[in-house]
C-alpha cells in the first residue's frame, strides 16, 4: 500500500464484481482501488448505471467481490465470516440510502433507536444516545414525529442520526441527496461533512451532484464500473 494511505481506515485494492459468466457476464465494477482516512470525505462520481451502488455495497460488506480486497481497520471484509459482518454493520459501518429507509409507524426517536435495540443496549443508554444523535442533526424537538410528519430533508437527517447513533468509523451514503431539492440537499451534505470532520469518520458518498463533489477530499469517477480520470467524458 502506498505510504500516503497507511493511516487509512477503509481501503480497497483491485476490487472487482462481475455478474453472470461468459458472454452473459456483466461488469459491476472492475479493478477499483481507493483509500479513506478518518475525517475524510471520498465521493464516488458517475452517471446512473456507472457502478456506484455496486462499489458501495462491496465497500460496506453487503456483497462479496469476485476479486480484490476490502479492508476496514484490521478486518478483511471480503473474507469475513457472517458473524464478523454482523459485528461490522452493528459497530463500525453506518449506511445512509437515497430512500431514507425509515419505518413509517415509528417516531423519529424510535427509528434512530433501532440499531441500539438490535445491539441490545440498555434502556438508559438508548435514551441518551438517541437524544444526542437527534440533537447532532438539528432535530431535537422532533423526537415524537413520524416520518410522514417530516420533510424530506428532515427524514434524511433522521436516517443520518440512525446511522451514527452508535460510534462509527465508516459512513457509506448512496445518493443521500437524490430525493431532495438542491437547497435541502446542500444542507444535508453540510451536515454529513461536519459530522465526518468532527467525529473522524471515513465517509464515502456516491453521487453525481456537483455540490456534493465540491465538498470532497477525494473523487473517484466511475464509468461502466471502471475508474476514469475525473472530468474525462470520452
Predicted regions and their residues:
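Short coil-to-helix segment of the ABC ATPase nucleotide-binding domain corresponding to the Q-loop/switch region
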Residues: 106-114
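A short, proline-enriched helix->beta-strand linker immediately N-terminal to the Walker B motif
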Residues: 165-169
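Conserved ABC transporter NBD signature motif
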Residues: 68-76
